[in-house]
């Protein structure tokens, strides 16, 4: 069984976005792993494994418009099912 079940990916579109601040917030406030927060001041790509993807979405939506959201159940994928 995986420690963190959901592969959560999305884009944040906004103004004055800071990938370092976003990464720090994730590290301090969310349980998970495989964090990737890359981009520029107007667009950040997020990739994160967590058991609470709704918390990630809520935080990211507070920073700007979120889109291209993908949440995959990696446990199902590991069992040969659609995630």
Residue positions per predicted region:
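N-terminal loops that bind phosphate or other acidic moieties
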Residues: 1-83
